């Protein structure tokens, strides 16, 4: 590397010396404690993975010079687990040493291995951390199935969530292509948060009853509910979930059903070689006459799908949806049997209709004199 690109070589040599010194002297922990303590009104902490052009150049260099050797190029990667473990530990120490409260924590690429360190954390430490959070937004990043690892962490989640009584927003996510196959309550432990307004779960195999039970626990206060890459286990139907959300969620203003499906169909789209088979319906732009704008955000719903000119996509019409034009009254008149749920596969075009159907319930709470969705 030194002869091919001296500048990059010198940069990585300097970084190595700096990182070695920081970790051996715990100077990173000292500086982090000092930094967090200096913010008397700190509101949010984000733990982000950094990989810049110099890092990518090094990976490419190693890969290129490993050709024809016994080194597996597929195994070349930066060790994020070690860095994430240290970051989680030091952030916890720094936060507990500060006077900060009402913190929103975001970790879009949390290593499950890093979280295992919390198994050894005293219950008082987990309680102190949990009590300071108002928002927990974490995605566990692993290309392999981590169901066993998360099962081992069940007790940690229980101690933490019991103490986290002030949570307003929760997002627990896993990669949708390697969904967690674990009972929901092994992480949520039947806990009801009185302050919870937003709940999001991603990348999970769940039964319809699990989703319904979770929603009912928070039916009086939940305003934003998001199911992302959630796959129903055999024995349940999405329309049963939708009926409960429509009829029993008193305050619901926003619903997102991004990439939901049935677990059996999800498994079937991978052939014996592990190659994904994508949906065969067109994804190109089509004129739209239906917009789901749930909540107060001006951004378009991530699951809003272009529809044909009469308000319903062709694939829904093939399932004999009874309407030919979009109106609030006609949408409200639909029954769960009219939604086209065949218990096998959820079409991309169905999701925005289902979201709108749930939010169109006549009893839906209105704020500022109007519903938080429009057509």
Walk through the language-model features, giving the residues of each.
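A conditional alpha-helix N-cap/helix-loop micro-motif detector
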Residues: 24-28, 84, 119, 149-153, ...
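Active-site-proximal segments of catalytic enzyme domains
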Residues: 135-155, 166-191, 198-202
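Concave beta-strand-loop units of leucine-rich repeat
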Residues: 47-52, 105-110, 138-144, 171-178, ...
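N-terminal adaptor/linker regions at the entrance to substrate-recognition repeat cores
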Residues: 1-120, 126-135
């Amino acid at each position: 590397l030194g002869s091919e690109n001296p500048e990059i070589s010198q940069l990585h040599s300097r970084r190595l010396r700096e990182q070695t010194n920081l970790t051996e002297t715990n100077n990173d922990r000292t500086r982090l404690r000092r930094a967090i303590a200096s913010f008397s009104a700190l509101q949010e902490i984000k733990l982000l993975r950094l990989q810049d052009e110099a890092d990518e150049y090094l990976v490419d260099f190693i890969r290129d010079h490993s050709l024809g050797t016994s080194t597996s190029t597929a195994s070349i990667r930066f060790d994020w687990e070690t860095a994430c473990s240290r970051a989680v530990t030091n952030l916890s120490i720094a936060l507990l040493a500060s006077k900060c409260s009402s913190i929103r924590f975001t970790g879009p690429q949390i290593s499950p291995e890093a979280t295992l360190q919390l198994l050894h954390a005293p219950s008082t430490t987990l309680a102190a951390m949990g009590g300071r959070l108002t928002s927990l937004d974490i995605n566990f990043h692993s290309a392999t199935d981590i169901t066993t690892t998360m099962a081992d962490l069940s007790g940690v989640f229980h101690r933490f969530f019991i103490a986290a009584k002030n949570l307003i927003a929760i997002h627990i996510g896993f990669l949708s292509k390697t969904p967690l196959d674990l009972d929901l309550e092994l992480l949520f432990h039947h806990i009801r948060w009185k302050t919870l307004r937003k709940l999001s779960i991603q990348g999970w195999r769940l039964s319809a009853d699990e989703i319904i039970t979770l929603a009912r626990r928070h039916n009086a206060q939940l305003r934003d509910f998001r199911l992302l890459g959630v796959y129903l286990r055999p024995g349940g139907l999405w329309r049963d979930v939708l009926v409960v959300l429509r009829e029993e969620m008193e305050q619901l203003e926003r619903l997102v059903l991004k990439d939901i499906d049935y677990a059996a169909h999800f498994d079937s789209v991978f052939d014996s070689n592990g190659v994904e088979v994508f949906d065969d319906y067109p994804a190109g732009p089509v004129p739209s006459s239906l917009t789901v704008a749930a909540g107060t955000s001006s951004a378009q719903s991530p699951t809003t799908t272009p529809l044909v000119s009469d308000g319903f996509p062709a694939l829904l019409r093939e399932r004999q949806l009874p309407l030919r034009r979009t109106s609030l009254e006609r949408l409200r008149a639909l029954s769960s049997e009219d939604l086209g749920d065949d218990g096998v596969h959820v079409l991309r075009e169905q999701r925005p209709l289902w979201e709108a159907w749930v939010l169109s319930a006549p009893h839906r709470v209105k704020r500022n004199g109007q519903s938080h969705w429009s057509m």
